[in-house]
């Protein structure tokens, strides 16, 4: 179904961060947009305020009449929705056009110049950073992001004048194979989603195939330390980047007085005096990749400087809630061992002489089973680790797989404990912290506003 032929859109799994951006896109086109989600959230409430019709019961009778015409209704679903979902079955049996979120984004990369960011981790921050640079430049852009931009308060940026669309390319369920990027950054390929891929080799092969999809005339910007093999089409340029080496990299890095500055080294034009608006060490590497893609498409040196200086970050990505001499409290979506490592390393670099404590909620039984030793090694960079029960998301429990696997493998010297998430607020009330971070992609983040209030009241 062509986008121009659509009159109504129904989203199954409307409250997901990626799906909500699709909802906002179609709402901006003045279409009827409705959908289902399992539970209400701040995001679904925001969508309802913006005009979307959402219900929270798996019930075909609750589908609006405006979304029951198969000829002009597009149904979009997330891979997390089971195939036997009653509403999905209804649409399938009645001949509706049903597409994954990634298929919709793939259509947009055929009508716009898609600037895509893929990778196990780093893709949300890098894509949001690139979108901000582009949006405030003379080029402008549309953007479908995997997190809520602090600059815009949304995960979707609309431009009526730009041919560029920045997209976070999701490797889960091989969704990014629907895209046809003009250019792409690949930030990392540390194995993940082994419940889907089975093996590390299959995971890396999925990224290799993704590189084949970049359009001739475009470019691949790949982190130089990745072990994957790219296989681009003729006419696609390949650039390497990292913090310290590659075609694009940083020099003269200075981390002092709570700020970070560096020079951006580029085969096109070096740009001195880059200042990070969100001064987190990992954002040096993310910034190099974001600036590389923006510069390759025509952003000027001043636009790069301004974009990086005014970049405000992403909700739940090294997201400071309290930051003063007595207490630092932040929330971070990190849920893969390498992400945990980067988060812990950044905290260590920023707060060398302070006690660093993490409350971590592991995400998925399969991920915990596959990587519990890696989680323990990464968390052991911190002084204290408080482990919550595993957040199951779409999964059923696996016998013998609990947070204790991580607990038992933490290195000697690390203070450690286990707690139910319902007891977290009581713990925070009962003791003092120096630097505290809530880690994970589960629902522990719902407690962050209350934790913030408790800590501020002390």
Predicted regions and their residues:
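Conserved hydrophobic helix-helix packing surfaces used for dimerization/oligomerization
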Residues: 8-9, 75, 115, 141, ...
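Phosphate-binding loop of NTP-binding sites
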Residues: 25-31, 62-67, 79-224, 228-237, ...
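N-terminal leader/targeting and accessory segments in enzymes
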Residues: 1-100, 104, 219, 249, ...
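Nucleotide phosphate-binding/pyrophosphate-handling subdomain across enzymes
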Residues: 2-8, 18, 25, 29, ...
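A glycine-rich beta-strand to alpha-helix segment
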Residues: 71-72, 423-454
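C-terminal helical cap/extension that packs against the catalytic core
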Residues: 50, 237, 376-434
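Beta-strand->loop->alpha-helix junctions that form or flank phosphate-binding loops
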Residues: 36-37, 55-60, 99-106, 144-146, ...
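Short internal beta-strands
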Residues: 31-38, 220-224, 357-360, 382-392
